[in-house]
């Protein structure tokens, strides 16, 4: 039986410790209160940062790198706006990717 996107997301979000912080990014519109929420249409399911150490010029300085993870189940489809957001984060020097498992997220985040 395939693991659901929600379950994969919870497992990946549990990696949020040490230098990695991931937060759920719900995107939508509440018609009753006329309020938009989330970053923007197509933005990733999990956003946050990954801390890295810069060397040699900034020896010892730790920097938070914007991190965006789009979580999909084994057969989940990536919408074009979601792919554009992931590509944009990459182009701007962030860490981003499509993850279908905790193993995918560990690889993306360089966690053992």
Predicted ranges, named:
Residues 1-112:
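Catalytic phosphate/metal-binding cores of nucleic-acid and nucleotide-processing enzymes, i.e., regions
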């Amino acid at each position: 039986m395939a693991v659901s996107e929600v379950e994969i997301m919870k497992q990946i979000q549990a990696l949020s410790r040490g230098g990695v912080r991931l937060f759920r990014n719900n995107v939508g519109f509440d018609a009753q209160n006329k309020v938009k929420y989330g970053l923007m249409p197509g933005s990733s399911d999990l956003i946050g940062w990954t801390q890295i150490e810069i060397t040699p010029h900034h020896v010892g300085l730790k920097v938070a790198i914007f991190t965006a993870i789009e979580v999909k189940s084994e057969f989940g489809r990536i919408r074009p706006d979601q792919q554009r957001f992931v590509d944009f984060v990459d182009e701007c020097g962030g860490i981003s990717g499509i993850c279908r498992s905790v193993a995918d997220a560990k690889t993306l985040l360089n966690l053992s």
